Amino acid sequence: MDQKQIEEIVRSVMASMGQDVPQPVAPSTQAGAKPQCAAPTVTESCALDLGSAEAKAWIGVENPHRADVLTELRRSTAARVCTGRAGPRPRTQALLRFLADHSRSKDTVLKEVPEEWVKAQGLLEVRSEISDKNLYLTRPDMGRRLSPEAIDALKSQCVMNPDVQVVVSDGLSTDAITANYEEILPPLLAGLKQAGLNVGTPFFVRYGRVKIEDQIGEILGAKVVILLVGERPGLGQSESLSCYAVYSPRVATTVEADRTCISNIHQGGTPPVEAAAVIVDLAKRMLEQKASGINMTR
């Protein structure tokens, strides 16, 4: 699927929902326009917030021959470029930012989604067989199965045999859920209903792994299961969400190749609203083709 197809899908789904189509961000230098002046090299400072946009745009190369080239390179990527060196070593600010980003990524793995937040969203909360974060990190197999209490809750409180079942799980990034939830779930549910699909009761799974959607789909009899789960964070990016969609999942027979994945959902990657529109179109195609993953015709 190329960019034009994605834009057409987003435009169609958003129009059917009666919402404005998000406009693409204008490039920094348009044809015929004068390029912006290069930003000066920022002096190292202990007072600088290492998580700020200013710190991310910092250029540590002293006395560059072409400062404008470095500025344009820095704008074009989130990679750690143009940080300069102090002899054979990284400069102090570059090292401190690396450590700060690593700490932020570690924090989002270890943090918990607050129970108050889940209640505020009006979501039913269930758990996998995991009881705490440490066990979640060391026993991924237990995160693939629902607890007995969760199974009973789903059978008693959720819509059975839906066309599409949407599930939210913390995964390996708490920030991915709390930061993107309001911009992806409401338009996703609205788009699915607008498409005339029977949507199940959305709920939150604490300590869930991707394969837990197979058991959920089997219990509820869902034709398509959509799991929104926090991705393993990278350095400096702790808010990335993934969508794993699967058709008619079964615990015993569904394999990873049966899933269709849309990753890198966040404001710096695929915008959540745009991702919601693409997921709606994906669910419709899965129901039409009665397949998912590598079994779908392109």
Curated annotation (Swiss-Prot):
Subcellular location field: Bacterial microcompartment
Pathway noted in the entry: Amine and polyamine degradation; ethanolamine degradation
GO biological process: amino acid metabolic process; ethanolamine catabolic process
Keywords, comma-separated and alphabetical: Bacterial microcompartment, Cobalamin, Cobalt, Lyase
UniProt xrefs under InterPro entries: EutC (IPR009246), EutC_C (IPR042251)
Any single Gene Ontology cellular-component annotation: ethanolamine degradation polyhedral organelle
EC number(s) recorded for this UniProt protein: 4.3.1.7
Top EC group: lyase
Co-factor binding details: Binds between the large and small subunits.
Family to which this protein belongs: Belongs to the EutC family.
Protein name: Ethanolamine ammonia-lyase small subunit
Source organism: Salmonella agona (strain SL483)
